Structures are given as structure tokens and as C-alpha cells.
Amino acid sequence: MKKSLKLFLFFVFISLALKAQSDSVFNKIVELGRTNNRVMVHQDYLCNIIGGRQTGSDAYTNAAYWAKSELESWGLEAQLDEAGEVPVGFNRGPWFGKMISPNQTLLEFGTPGYTAGTKGKQKGHVAVLNSDDTLSDSIKNKIKGAWIFLQKENDGWPRDRDSVSEFTKKLIDAGALGTVMSAKHPIQLLDLRNVNDWNDLPKLPDIRLIDHQFNEIKELVLKGEEVILEFDIRNFFKQGPIKYHNVIGLIPGTEFPDEYVVLGAHLDSYDAATGAIDNGSGAARMLEAIRLLVKSGAKPKRTIMIQLYAAEERGLIGSRSWVKKNQDKHDKISVMLNNDGGTNPIVGMGIPKVIYDYIKPVIEPIENLELKYPFKLQETGIIRRAGRGGTDSHSFTMAGIPAPWLRLEGPHVYRTTWHTVLDTYDQVIPDAQEHSALVIALLAYQIANLDKLLPREGAFLPEGIYADLNTNRGTITLNIDYQNVPMTSANFIGLAEGVIKNNAVKPGKSFYNGSIWHRVVPGHVIQAGIPNIVLDSLNEDNIPGYEFPNEINSGLNHGKAGMLGMANAGPHTNGSQFYITLGDRSYLDGNYTLFGSVIEGMDVVNNIVQGDTIKSVSITRIGDEANKFRPDTESFLKMVEEAKQKVKADDEKKLKAEEEWIRINLPDATESESGIKYKIVSQGTEYKTEKAQTLKVRYSGNVLIDKLSFVSTSNEGKPDFAAEVHEFDFVIGTTKINNGLDKMISEMKPGEKRIVVVPSHMAYGTTGYYGKNIPGQKRFVISPNSTLYYEIEIVE
């Protein structure tokens, strides 16, 4: 049967692959993509005719209308989809600057978007200030008519990011021309987002000057030289409100017109350059991909939809708007392919196994093409609906729509141009653009023609809290059971996020980053949780400076590999150390707190050796309830105190139950000085035993309240599950079982029988007893703090 199924799947796979290879449209897309690829025409228009496309700018509006017009000219249904509005618009003009004296030098600088320009050419001296300087009268005289050099370094954001500061207001009142900050190469420039009133526009220019020029000028001023600078910055505002739109285009599906494959890229950009890489490259690829599909005569089963988004740089506003307005379509979107990673060629697509297995047959023809940049489908981890997101695919992911990772690989270093003055057309790699547009077109066509939508079950992580242990051998992903084991979960999460006070790591620092796997027992556990660098050279036994009770949940057990638990030195001594099981360790149940399990990366767990490193730990929350679970020191300590009170109450209840049992069942028992209660059932001989004498002994018994039964074995009298009671040799003063039992046996005479109740502190105490671990057999365990009942006989 299995052989027949494998043959059937093999022939299905082959037939799908051959169908794609013989598909005339597939071949036509390839031909056009190689011989008539116009992606760089779109790129040129976006960058060199329209330019930087800031949200709220005329350039963005022009780009949206142009893209819609292009789609319509190719025969697509196209529309502008309103995504939002800004109360005030912004258009950037040219900017110039130079040092006039003590020598003439052109200045390399820029300004963030939505900040003030100059009043024509403005010339003034340089004054160096700190942003916290008190503006005395003498300083105010120096500020008037000056360019103010601030001792702050550029981070891209405007000087008054959230609101106009009091310091800025004082500079304006004192007659400053503008502020200047130092900026590293390449100069990164973002935008101001609090320009909400046409009657209250920014007034003071906000200049970012390349660092070496900034430092040279500052040194001259500090030496007492007068430096004169001139700036001409043409930043223009536009009275709003100004609406901005996504651009939507459709190739209708022939069989499933209400099901979709979405091709997405954001059309907006920052405007200090021309938005070539971020994200003109992505928009141009998507435009060309849809053009190739139309020109090849594609009639896909499902509708292929191109979406060019507005205001991605302002928080994925365009894509979020569309996703929110089209909730009825969520279940009908097979996939969303997004390009916002730069100009390097697309060489792969990463998807979870459940999708990989389904899609592989129709992707193989793309893999088999002789491309300059070979393409490969890759199996990746489960999709996560979490985080703020850095690109528009996140809007779809959060709605449960597959938006796989397109892997780009090549010579361009994205961060060298990202949001900087270098994001220009000359940075684009033409053949990588052409290749990628072709690959996107083929992916869209193949997926749109599948018999069914891409599977989602098993592709997304369920709602919950997850921890990624990034180790030197790979990533281990843990599901944290915060709902059933909240206190222990809060401890782990709080330490990982640096929000629980401890005696080893400074506040705000992740407790586990840089720690090692200090204990690895093959087939048993791997264990970590001691910081690599601790404060004041603390003894590891005292870390993290507190202990908290066990939190046993019956719904979790040690019955398999990959269970996550807290290591302890006895009941209620949990701290920071945790372990992951390497096999069935059911005998640990009840004595160690489990609070999660491995969901991905078990291969990494199995490869960990002692001394391997946890580079970092990151916490992911998915869903409203998970996002509400935000432990801190106060909330954690409150849980600990409540747990301690419960432990105390449970112990008192247990003690009373034991006392009641003894009162009813052994009313005439004798109590020793150590608290052992016993009753002589049968008197032995008058013969007194002596130290070093060997006795033949046997016993049976149980845990007093829990009723776990056990008997003596021939192995030095150790307890076990065995049904038959075994005699054993007990050498007085030498044989050690537990203190209470040893004491009772040593006092007994040959032939004597006793019923004995040994309190936990005289039995196995806080450590409990663990029998020999035999593979394939349940391990015998007496839990810590167990009071034991014995029936003992001295045979001879």
C-alpha cells in the first residue's frame, strides 16, 4: 500500500512538473523576461522623472497616478485605493550650502523631511551649544543670526521628533538661523511626523552635516575663529488635507476570480534621494512582473493582484488599510509576495514545510531554468503573527495570510543606502532587477494555477508566547505555557527581557544572553541558566538572588524529549536554571516544574554539547492575551508570595492529614526523639543486636498520604516497585537506606516486626529518592518531602 502511494505521488509530481514545462504561457513569460524586460524603464521613471516619493508629496501622488496609468495601458483593471491623509503636505526642492570663511568649502549635508527650509540664502556665523545649555543673555547674543552646532549625532530623525522642544522655541526667539548636527556617511534622513497644522509649521531649519566637516568647523570655532556658513534649503509645505492612495491592478482569474495571488511593494520612499533601492526596486519588479504576465497572454485560474502601497515608511499604513478594509478576502488570498529587500536578485523563497510540500512540484520548473541567479525553494520555520513588522508583508502575516520570505542575495549592501542620500538609481543592479521580475511573474503564475489555495493549517504559530534561544549551533524555539504555569513563565520571560531584578545581571540586560549550556547529560537533559558574566563574582548557587516554589501542572509531563523545565536543588528552590529533556523522563514528574516545550530546533537541542553558547534569547508574543502578559519584578514577586502562601497551606494540610491518619490507625504508637512513630507488632528474641552485625531484613510500605507502594529489594534494601518483598542484608552502622529506617532497623531484634512512620526529614528529605534508571522501564521515585509508612521484619 505504501509503495503504491509513493508511486502515485511520484507520478503526480512528475505530471505537474511536465505540465509547467510544456505550458506555452510559462515559456512565453520566460522568453519575454529574457528578451523584452522593461523593469529598468519603470525604475528610471520612478527615480529620475518622479524622484523621492515622500508621503504627502506631489511626487508620491504623481507616482500613484503614473502607476495606475501604466497598469491600464497594459490592459489591467486598475484603481486608486484611498489609504489615508496627512493634514499638511511636503515637497522637497534642491539644497545648497558652503563655508564662506575662513575659507570657501562646499558642504555635504541634508535635512529630514517635513522640516523647515531657509528664507532664501541665509548667511551667518557658527555658535557651538549643548542642547541642555541655559540660554543666558550672553549666549543669546551669540545665537542671534547664527547657525547653532549641537553636540548631538544624527540618527535620521528630526530634532523635534515628537513635539517642538522648549530649547528650539528659545533658539527661534533668540534669532538663530538653524541647527546643525553631525552625521556619519552616508547621511541618513527620515521625516517629521507632527506637522498637523498649516498655521503652525516648522520654523527652524534642521541640518545634518557630514561628520568630518562638522568636526573641522567646530574645532575652528572652539579655537576662537569666526566661521561663516551659507545655506539655501528649499523645503516646501502644502496646505492639506492631502489624501494618499495605494495602487491596485487585477488580472482576473478564469476559474476562481474571487481567489487571489497578491504581488506587493511599497511605492513611497524617503526623499533625501530618489527612493531607488527602497523601494523603487521592489515597485519596478512588481510592475514588470504583472506586465510580463499580461503580455504573455496569461489567463490564471486565480486573480493576480498587484498592490503598490502608500505610506509604508510611516508604519505600513497603506497595506494595513487594505487588509483592514478587505477582511472578506483574507481566506481567499493564496499568497502575498512582497519585495522590499533591495536590488539583489531573488534566489529563493522560504516557506513552512506544510506549504513547501504542496507547492514544490510547481516551483521545480522555475528551479530547473538556466538562470544567471539560480532559484531554490527553501523550507523554513513556521510563520509568526507577531511584532511591529518592517515591511508590508507583515500586514498580511498578521491577518493569517501566507506571505513567504523572498531571499535576495548579491553584492549590494542594503544598509549602505537605506534611508540615506545614496538611495539613487546608480545603485540598482539591472540584471538582478530583470531576473527578479521574471521570477516573481513565474511564481505568481504557478501559484495562481494550483488546484487549491496554499494550505494554512500548520503554517502559522498559534497564539501564545515563544522564546527563541539563538545558540552557536542554531535556533531553538520554545513554546512558553504562560497560561497554565504563569509564575515560572513570568520568571523566565522576565529574566530574558531584563525586567526582573536579580543579583547577577544589570537591569535592562537579558539575563541569558551569552550564557552556556553548563550541564549536558546524553539521553537525559541539557541545562543552562547561569549568566556568563555575573556581578561581584557571585557564587552560582546564589544566582539569581531569589527562589520560588514549584508550580506543577498535571497537563504537562516529562514523557518525551523537548520538554522545558526548571532545574532545582529540592522542592521550591527554583531560580534561573532551566533544562530541556533529551528523552522520556517521566520519573521527574511532580518534582520539577515544566513550563513549555520545543516546537522547532530539536535537531539543535540534540547537537548541543557542554560549553555551547546561548548567544541571545528573544521573546515573541502572538495574540491579545499573550501581549497582555508583561511580567515585571513587582508582578512576579506578588505571584511568588501567593505561591509560598499556598505551599505553606498545603504543607499544613498535609501534616494534619498525616497526624489524623496516625491518630486513627496507630493510636498507641510510640514516638522517638526524632519524631519517628512506631508500633511493635511482634516481639523478637531477647538477643540484642550490635554494631557491624548483619541482619536479614525485609519490608513493605507506602508514601503515607499519596499511597505509592514499595517493597524492599535485595540491592542493599533499596525500595522499588517489585511485587514481591525481598530480603536483604543490613549491616548495622554500615548499610544506608534512609536515616529513619536505618535507626529503626538498628534498634530491632531478630524476629521482631514493627509498623513505622518515618517523617520526611528522617526519610529522603527535600531530595527524594530516585531508583535506578532502566531503559524501557518506569523509574521508581519517592518524591521529596514524603512521610513514609513501613512494615518491617527482622528475619534473622
Give names to the regions the model predicted.
Residues 20-59, 69, 77, 251-253, ...:
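N-terminal hydrophobic or amphipathic helices/low-complexity stretches enriched
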Residues 23-25, 108, 112-137, 196-275, ...:
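Soluble metallo-hydrolase cores and metallopeptidase-like ectodomains found primarily
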Residues 41, 293-317, 336, 750, ...:
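Short helix-loop-beta-strand segments that form the rim/entrance of peptidase-like active sites
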Residues 44, 48-147, 153-155:
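Noncatalytic luminal/extracellular "stalk/propeptide" segments of secretory-pathway proteins
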Residues 109-205, 274:
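Extracellular/luminal Protease-associated
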Residues 291, 295, 414-458:
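His/Asp/Glu-rich mid-to-C-terminal helical/loop segments that flank catalytic regions of hydrolases
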Residues 309-409:
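Metal-dependent peptidase/peptidase-like ectodomains
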Residues 459-796:
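Cross-family detector of peptidyl-prolyl cis-trans isomerase
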